[in-house]
């Protein structure tokens, strides 16, 4: 797989080595000994236990869902090896997230765009847990973890659980110290009527979300199936997830959907009294509500004068990175998002930042993204997903929906926003035209969201 080689080369670039530091191949951080393999083999009978999900039309909550969502997942270990594994995972999350973004941006020119790299990566891990043989090996390679020996051995289940543990650690850090934000993640499995699902597979997905649901849907009527799924997910998300699907594949046996939402009410940030101009393109402007941030933030302008970057803390655990083109340059075509260079060498500056209030969401089908990356068969009809079901599954859409909202807790503009000490000069940075954004967990620098804002009013 060319992509695998590219991922490993990029990881080598992202991971500087020093003479007093021993390099550990990322796969070794998730490897295990013979006794672990034997323990896995002993679980094979359990792994063959299946259940048939209740109908999506059922008005009562099935017992298996109560059991699943009562099962609390322990916090991930913060051991040295766990921290090192987390660093590798977050680098691969960044690389694949940038690849997925590149696959989407051309198809959605002129539109707001948002995806969650951690959520998309977690979806691939989910299918890896359900895959066998060559499909498992291909997914492992795409995820960036290729054993040095070339022999995957019996790694699938333990490897997937360890990666989920790292991803969950990141999400727990987001929520750990912040009352001013709301962060939630929901996973739904929709199977055709009568299709059995592996109990062990579904249980293994528990660390990947705050809530997990499995229901049966009749896909033979695509419009009705889409309507039922939309209604179900809107109800379970308390109105947050809307219009997830417009249609479904009537030949599908399984549809996978993840919905991740982040809403932040930034402290000590004011909303300007008057709406401000935002240029959708060179000829079109709209009036939008704006927020005003003042403080010392990390900032840089790239050497070629193509773009500027500012990094702003928006909570105790989150960083918002904003990237704006200079002189109407096409940043997306020139910026190597897969490299971390655009996030490096920022310097503290006194800045007065003005940017729109944001309510932005995006939905992507992992199947389409893989096809755009020339991997259309990875989860196609020939995929071996025998650990999900003993039926011969046809996977339909693999939906990942992301939602991000940014508001300020202040209602008024500061009385005198130009008042400054005589010896302090503030740099004015105003985002009043198309810009890119990324949201990172502050401690690990893991990328939670990546997106583009072309019109802040879309989504309000």
Regions found by a protein language model. Name each.
Residues 47-60, 64, 110-111, 146-326, ...:
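Non-catalytic, conformational "gating/processing" segments within enzyme and secreted inhibitor domains
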Residues 329-330, 362, 412-413, 446-447, ...:
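Flexible loop/turn segments at secondary-structure boundaries
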Residues 256, 308-323, 422-460:
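Extended hydrophobic
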Residues 123, 404, 445:
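Terminal peptide-recognition signature
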Residues 134-144, 330-333, 456-459:
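Extended intrinsically disordered, low-complexity coil regions enriched in Ser, Thr, Gly, Ala
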Residues 327-346:
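Internal alpha/beta scaffold segment
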Residues 2-218, 412:
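Detector for small/aliphatic-rich hydrophobic stretches
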Residues 33-37, 331-334, 416-417:
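Extracellular, intrinsically disordered low-complexity regions of secreted proteins
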